[in-house]
Curated annotation (Swiss-Prot):
Highest classification ranks of the organism: Eukaryota, Metazoa, Chordata, Craniata, Vertebrata
Residues in the signal sequence: none
Matches recorded under Gene3D superfamilies: Cysteine proteinases
Entry keyword set: Hydrolase, Protease, Thiol protease, Ubl conjugation pathway
Name of the protein this chain belongs to: Ubiquitin carboxyl-terminal hydrolase 40
Region Disordered, annotated ranges: 1180-1235
Family of this protein: Belongs to the peptidase C19 family.
Catalysed reactions, semicolon-separated: Thiol-dependent hydrolysis of ester, thioester, amide, peptide and isopeptide bonds formed by the C-terminal Gly of ubiquitin (a 76-residue protein attached to proteins as an intracellular targeting signal)
Positions of the USP domain: 41-482
Biased composition regions of type Basic and acidic residues, renumbered to the chain: 1180-1190
Domain of life: Eukaryota
EC number assigned by the record: 3.4.19.12
């Protein structure tokens, strides 16, 4: 399957087009890791299947269950190959369990996979791969197995091993009649809360009696009357394997939430069930059970992790522990000398005996490192040489394979070695550091292991006590009858009981795994080197370059990195038959300037791993002195640096141009900085380097003369760095006006100037070099010169910035520098006709109306001392508008009409109008100073509830005197639906800011449309501000002046009719309440309710006020606030209380704060629980509104996705909010019918 990827021939050569870049090596999929020192296999977690893994390991380490399953052959269960045949009855679940158990027993891998088994369960979604309850899985899996084994000799497998019965009895105290009921069980469920342990729980369940007396009598069928009685339960039949499920998870009815019981709950390693059984005449050994598995849950009731403690009954695993430091090593009399124990010969023989007398050589070094805590090279290489050489020198003990990849002990020395090892094993392991495992007396102690998905670790029996309590505690217990004895041939024999076809399958799989591991090991130890042949290179421009092409100069060599440098040199000699003389191999690297040699490789006896050569390394093959007759300097000190050198261009006549040119140059890193002047033939000059400390890297710093002898590296220059060269005899913008050199100057950059003078020229755009200190006047003159325009433009032109949308901004004064004008390098400027405004003038944009389209603004230059009135006249004249009914407004930052410029005699400077501002010509004359022009709207709640019956439909008079706004998401009532508001425009009034609210109402009543409403007096009107085309703030005090309301100059007022006058206090909140109609998802018409928030402002206070208003018991109502923008109702409950940790005081929810933000005009839904017990407050209109919002959001999302696809712009992932807890789903296993 791997093709020729793992060829035995390590040295392969290919001519590769190396110039295209290094190849990306695809790493082959590695085979599963072998078993660890315990020699037991774990099970891989598929995401959340730790609950399944723990139960499967328990069943696997139940030998009677495992062997009973193995006893079912293909003639009963069917064949895997026939599972897709329609007529074949293939019992896929038992087959997959057999194969999984065989893999856990025999396959040499760290962890087995349950993917095939879960597929046979029908688990195709991610839901089953999340964590579930292992107790639930235990019952479901047993049920699925029973169904799968119907009609086979194993049909009673679960019944024989796990089935037990309980008998419940009630004994009449009068006639002694016994009424009994028998129950079957596969596991016993016992309580944990308020119980000290398992024996205590069993005593409560099967020993203590429940007595029926007094008010709780029992009706006896024999006596036919209520009598005293006693109820009890007993275990009638005990299964060979007893499963106990602990009720760790309970429900707190006070907090209304689940919780995990973490109190101490003990359980014995051996338990006598005789006191709890109905029959007690049997021998005591019949009732003795031994604990052999504990499934442990770590976490809470909504998540966590399972693992299992398991007793290895058959001693299949290797049960070893680290020796404790506190214990003495051994009796000194029994110890050999430390030097003898520390001899590598003894340690290597011990390792080989542990590894079944065969191990790859490279793994032998790793095992040695693990044993003694130090590598071979550091401890023994100096005295004994390389490890492979040491093995070769002791050929009378060690036998290397033909390719020297593996090593084993010779047969004639293995017996002697084994006796030596047995004599010295204790000393060796006692001398090892604590990390290495030691041997223990594993015969007398029970073998317990902690199996945590893929990981298997040995534990001591006393470690089980740690799982009595806490967040990580026992959840299921498995006991086996102590009389169950295992046959001697099953001890430490994983092949016992496994059918032949599975033995053959596992043997073949192990051979395939070994082959793959060998191939993978070979691939992992093979790397690619790029050989650069010296004769094919020449030294040019400071670095090495191919003479012809990379194809002829570079050879790709695949080589085994476990071989030595001498082997590599010999292989290259054989490949390069034309080579004559010495051959030196050096590490080279491709740098921006070319190829550079860093260091030569020495020590032919070293392996390539020890020389630290990396995969894909560039190796230069040469004589070590010269290339093409040029002596080559090597090392990092003389590494070539590719620098960008900037200097002023020189024209053909020797005149210095203003254009700065950039050219690459290569210099050795250890060369003096001053050599750059020699390279450019500049006799004297100043060198500027880019200052790293400047923000954005836009600053330059001059190198002092005393530092000119420092090297490029000492100056901090590296590949890609830029340096600026200034000739000392130049007099241009790179010098200050005093012609003195400065130690810091700003970076030179460019501006783009476009010809917008409507004059013909050869160039439409030029690039002008400048610094941030360059004057705008100089840039303008340079642009006119380079655009080859008339010199007369110098007196009648200006530069105007162009924004990203192509709009021309206000002209920049000539006297400004680029920094003062806030112009960034790379900006675009337009050369336009007309002078730039002087320092006393303003350049303004203006447009008519508030809906300004981009590009339609007009321009004007005025004196900053001009008045608003005169400025308005100039703008009206320039735009061709007639009349005096106009006023000016300044456009605000969000491109909307701002406050009007009311002080018409004030100057623009006094009103802080600046160049570039936009003024809007708005139709309508401003009211006199101190007066307001207020639009008046009519606010009519739709429907008949509590309003004037003589009102006409507002839409009837729309065409004659008004316009209607319908705010579909406003508060209010509309018959049976919450909240639809119509605002009807009545007209404008002019009123003094000192007038009262009552005077505003009176003046509004003089508007012609008011005559049709028949409002008796201003006291029968309620005033609201208009915000976003619907009622906003309630204006409550009639005698308060309008100025004190701070309404602003753009205020609009809507008036609502009342049946009678009202006097609302400052703490009163006006609410629209609507009672829900049961069963119809609609509401009755709204009624106004005034709630005094000064009495507490809490949910309880409002609930009481609503209950009093509707004459209902407070405990029989539910209320909720309506959010019309979201079409949502938020229930208001007096139980919403928070408890702070410090003071332990209840913190009331004040409804005028979060999350309710209750204010005037809000809609409150009221539910009468006496006749309506539905939890829902929403209406059909809410459903429709939410659906429309969802469709709009979906449309916006699709348009955004389409825009992103067009622009190929990938948005960075936003922070994901915490996901709500997913609903719990039931677990099931799908089984076919075999009846």
């Amino acid at each position: 399957m791997f093709g020729d990827l793992f060829e035995e021939e390590y040295s392969t050569v290919s001519n590769n087009q190396y110039g295209k870049g290094k190849k990306l090596k695809t790493k082959a999929l590695e085979p599963p890791a072998p078993r660890e020192f315990t020699n037991l296999s774990g099970i891989r977690n598929q995401g959340g299947t730790c609950y399944l893994n723990s139960l499967l390991q328990t069943l696997h380490f139940t030998p009677e269950f495992r062997e009973a399953l193995f006893s079912l052959g293909p003639e009963e269960l069917g064949l895997f190959e026939d599972k897709d045949k329609p007529d074949a009855k293939v019992r896929i679940i038992p087959l997959q369990l057999q194969r999984l158990f065989a893999q856990l027993l025999l396959l040499d891998q760290e962890a087995a996979s349950t993917a095939d088994l879960t597929d046979s369960f029908g688990w195709t979604s991610n839901e089953e791969m999340r964590q579930h309850d292992v107790q639930e899985l235990n019952r479901i899996l047993f049920s699925a197995l029973e169904t799968s084994l119907v009609g086979t000799s194993g049909h009673d497998l679960i019944y024989r091993l796990y089935h037990g019965t309980i008998v419940n009895q009630i004994v009449c105290k009068e006639c002694k009649n016994v009424s009994e009921r028998q129950e079957d069980f596969l596991d016993l469920t016992v309580a944990v809360k308020n119980v000290s342990g398992l024996e205590d729980a069993l005593w409560n369940m099967y020993v203590e009696e429940e007595v029926f007396d007094c008010d709780n009598l029992y009706h006896c069928g024999t006596c036919d009357r209520l009598v005293k009685a006693a109820k009890s339960a007993k275990l009638r039949k005990l299964p060979p394997f007893l499963t106990v499920s602990l009720l760790r998870f309970n429900f707190d009815f006070v907090k209304c939430e689940r919780y995990k019981e973490t109190s101490c709950y003990t359980f014995p390693l051996r338990i006598n069930l005789k006191p709890f059984c109905e029959q007690s005449e049997l021998d005591d050994l019949e009732y003795i059970y031994d604990l052999f598995s504990v499934i442990i849950h770590k976490g809470g009731c909504y998540g966590g992790h399972y693992h299992v403690y398991i007793k290895d009954v058959d001693h299949l695993g290797n049960w070893q522990f680290q020796e404790e430091k506190s214990k003495p090593d051994v009796n000194l009399k029994d110890l050999q000398s430390e030097e003898e124990i520390d001899h590598p010969l003894m340690i290597l023989k011990a390792i080989l005996l542990e590894e079944n007398n065969l191990i790859p050589v490279d793994q032998l070094g790793q095992k040695l490192l693990k044993k003694i805590g130090i590598s071979w090279n550091k401890k023994y290489r100096k005295q004994h040489g390389p490890l492979r050489k040491f093995l070769q020198l002791h050929s009378q003990i060690f036998l290397l394979s033909s390719d020297e990849s593996t090593v084993r002990l010779l047969k004639n020395s293995s017996l002697q070695a084994e006796s030596d090892f047995q004599r010295n094993d204790q000393q060796i392991f006692k001398m090892l550091p604590p990390e290495s495992p030691g041997l223990n007396n594993s015969i007398s102690c029970p073998h317990w292991f902690d199996i945590n998905d893929s990981k298997v670790q040995p534990i001591r029996e006393k470690d089980i006590e740690q799982q009595f309590q806490g967040k990580e505690s026992a959840y299921m217990l498995f006991y086996r009858k102590s009389q169950l004895q295992r046959p001697p041939e099953a001890r430490a024999n994983p092949r016992y009981g496994v059918p032949c076809h599975l033995l053959n399958e596992m043997d073949a799989a192990n051979i395939e795994l070994q082959t793959k591991r060998a191939e993978c090991d070979s691939a992992n130890n093979t790397f690619e080197l790029h050989l650069h042949l010296g004769p094919q290179y020449h030294f040019f421009n400071g670095a090495l370059h191919p003479v012809v092409s990379q194809t002829e100069s570079v050879w790709d060599l695949t080589f085994d990195k476990r071989k030595t440098l001498g082997d590599l040199r010999q292989s290259i000699f054989q490949l390069l038959e034309f080579w004559e003389g010495d051959m030196v191999l050096s590490v080279a690297k491709l740098v921006p300037a070319g190829l550079h040699i860093y260091q030569s490789l020495g020590g032919d006896e070293l392996t390539l791993c020890e020389t630290e050569i990396a995969d894909g390394e560039d190796i230069f093959v040469w004589n070590g002195v010269e290339v093409g007759g040029v002596h080559i300097q090597t090392g990092i000190d003389c590494e070539p640096l590719l620098l960008n050198v900037l200097h002023l261009d020189t024209s053909s006549d020797g005149e210095k141009c203003c254009q700065v040119i950039e050219s690459p140059h290569v210099f050795p890193a250890n060369a003096e900085v001053g050599t750059v002047l020699t390279a450019l033939a500049i006799p004297a000059g100043v060198i500027f380097i880019n200052s790293a400390g400047c923000p954005g890297g836009e600053g330059w710093t001059a190198i002092p003369k005393e530092d000119m002898r420092k090297t490029f590296r000492e100056q901090g220059l590296r590949n890609g760095s830029s340096i600026l060269i200034q000739d000392s005899h130049d007099d241009n913008s790179l010098l200050t006006k005093e012609e003195k050199w400065v130690t810091s100057m700003n970076e030179i950059d460019w501006l783009h100037v476009k010809n917008l003078c409507q004059l013909e020229s050869e160039e439409k755009q030029v690039k002008i070099s400048a610094t941030v200190n360059t004057m705008v006047f100089d840039i303008r003159i340079k642009a006119i010169k380079e655009l080859k325009l008339m010199k007369e433009l110098a007196d009648n032109s200006c530069l105007r910035p162009i924004d990203r949308n192509g709009k021309l901004l206000c002209p920049v004064p000539d006297s400004y520098t680029l920094k003062e004008a806030e112009l960034k390098m790379g900006s675009s400027l337009g050369l336009c006709l007309g002078k730039a405004p002087s320092s006393s003038q303003l350049f303004l944009f203006f447009a008519m109306g508030s809906d300004v389209q981009p590009g339609t603004e007009m321009e004007i230059v005025v004196e900053e001392t001009i008045s608003v009135r005169d400025c308005l006249k100039l703008m009206l004249k320039k735009s061709g508008l007639q009349g005096d009914a106009w006023h000016l407004r300044k456009m605000d930052w969000c491109y909307e009409a701002g406050e009007p410029l009311c002080e018409e005699d004030a100057t623009l400077k006094e009103l802080l109008i600046c160049s570039g501002d936009t003024l809007l010509l708005i139709e309508g004359q401003l009211p006199p100073l101190g007066f307001l022009k207020v639009p008046i709207w009519w606010y009519q709640l739709q429907g008949p509830s509590g309003h004037w019956e003589s009102h006409q439909d507002q839409t009837n008079c729309t065409s004659s005197w008004g316009r209607v706004w319908r705010a579909t998401s406003s508060q209010g009532a509309s018959g049976n639906e919450p909240a639809q508001v119509s605002l009807l425009y009545l007209g404008d009034i002019e009123i003094s800011e000192d007038a009262t609210l009552a005077e505003l109402k009176s003046q509004a009543m003089t508007l012609p449309p008011f005559l049709e409403f028949g409002v008796p007096s201003p006291a029968h009107l309620r005033a609201w501000t208009v915000e976003r085309k619907r009622p906003g703030r309630l204006l409550r005090t009639d005698r308060q002046p309008l100025r004190e309301y701070k309404l602003g100059r753009r205020i609009e007022i809507c008036l609502e009719p009342l049946q009678k006058g009202e006097n609302l206090g400052p703490q009163d909140v006006l609410l629209r309440t609507q009672v829900r109609i049961p069963g119809e998802r609609t509401y009755a018409p709204a009624l106004d309710l005034v709630w005094n928030a000064a009495q507490g402002g809490t949910a309880g206070s409002l609930r009481q006020r609503v209950a009093d208003f509707y004459r209902l018991p407070v405990e029989k109502i539910e209320i909720a606030k309506y959010f019309p923008e979201k079409f949502e109702w938020l229930p208001i409950s007096s139980w919403n209380q928070q408890i702070t940790k410090r003071k332990k005081k209840k913190k009331q929810d004040y409804l005028q704060g979060a999350p309710y933000y209750l204010k005037d005009g809000d809609t409150i839904g009221v539910k009468n629980l006496l006749i309506d017990d539905d939890d829902d407050f929403s209406t059909i209109r809410d459903d429709t509104g939410k659906e429309k919002q969802k469709q709009r959001a979906l449309g916006r999302r699709k348009s955004q996705e389409a825009l992103h696809e067009q622009s190929s712009y990938i948005l960075s992932s936003a922070e994901t909010p915490a996901r709500p807890r997913a609903p719990e789903t039931s677990l099931s296993i799908h089984v076919g019918s075999f009846r």
